[in-house]
Amino acid sequence: MAAGDYRSEVVPHEERPDQEPKGQDTVVVDHELENGRRLYRPTRWQSNLTILSCYIANFSDGFQNSLANPTNVIFKQLLGPSGYPSEMQTRISNALLIGAILGVVALGYISDMTSRRAGLLFTSGLVTIATLMSALALQVHPSHNMLWYFVIVRGICGFGVGGEYPPSAAAGIEESDDFKRRYRGPIFVSFTTLMATSAAPIQMIVYLVCLKASNNNLPVTFHAIYSIATILPAIILVLRFFMTDSTLFHYSNFKRQKKSPRFYWLLVRKYWPRLFTTSLAFFLYDFINFPNSIMSSSIISSLVKDHNIQTTAIWQVILAALPVPGVLVGAWLTNAIGRRYTGLVGFAGYVVLGFIIGGTFSKLSQHMAAFVVLYGLLQAFGHLGPGATIGLISTESFPTAMRGMGYSVATAFGRTGAAVGTQCFTPLQEAAGKSATFYLAGGVAVLGMIVYWFLPESGDLNLEEDDRALEEYLAQNGFSMERKA
């Protein structure tokens, strides 16, 4: 079967014995059923392939993001503090983030105006090439040139990683809605936050195994972890040649839409409250989550008494694994209490633990196990709440035709928050001590709770009804959407 094939079948409205009421499991394209036309429906294996590729892709993206921790340790050991100053460490960390911001914005638009599949093929190819270039960084001399080369290629990789988010999130939520509507929230969390979070401890285990196998040979370890990181997007690239766009996107998109400045203004005018609140919530969460994740290696390394690189890596594995149960609880809570309240619970835990760790840091840092457990619980609450729900809310809050763009704007603000937070946390830590960063995280989490209160409860939204509402709104304002047969 060709990559773009789909199953065509006539499904009369009155002859479907298994049809469920709206809002349940089965997606029904109303206008097609009423007219007795042939339905566009991706085959089950194509839908499953799309979701599978989203699982692997988000794992790959999490693997890419978590590479910052071992990279910082390796470069600091190889080059020393003078050869790898804090400002260069910040540049390398921010390169992936800034690239991600540009990629998110560009691919959010492209995936809505062309297709999810085209955007995903491009991003997978770009991440593969850029990661391979990163693996060759230690061959560049002198070290100053090598660091700048690494900044550039990580920025390119970041463009691909960031560009992955809008089409992947949109395609995943649409296929989940096709498959099991009432479970689309937990399914979405499982292939986004759970995969990205699980990638961190697995990446650290790979790093630790490479250290052991090479007898602490850091250049060999560096090449090994980046080579493995190259394989993942290459596999995804192959899988995505066989995927196709979802039913929702097939019937509701802007491919043939006449787009003037007024057209975009109409979209902003209708959806600006959702756009503003999701973007602000994303900004606040990433402002504290990314710096805390990236800086964990430096904090733990400074607390290990003999500065042994393997001991540091073992503690990092434990710390990286602790948030995973939080994601599982968050996935369950998205349906149990709703997306919004799940986010509030997570931010509340972040507030409490942030201030506890900050207030007891001087004594806590003398007991590594206690520190790692509390630090891990802090991260677990973050991943349970906003980590599990902000991407889900941002994806569900916009109709299909502009889902990529809406999600991309919110995510771009999130990545901007991550870049700003990374830029702020390192100088703050150097000026006021490590405890100050936890106080800041707790304070920002309070703001996050306030913003979350105003977010829509996106689990109650019917994606098809939102699509029809957008079509009617545009028609009333002189823009009739041309629907594909």
Label the model's feature ranges.
Residues A2-A485:
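Transmembrane-helix signature of 12-pass secondary carriers
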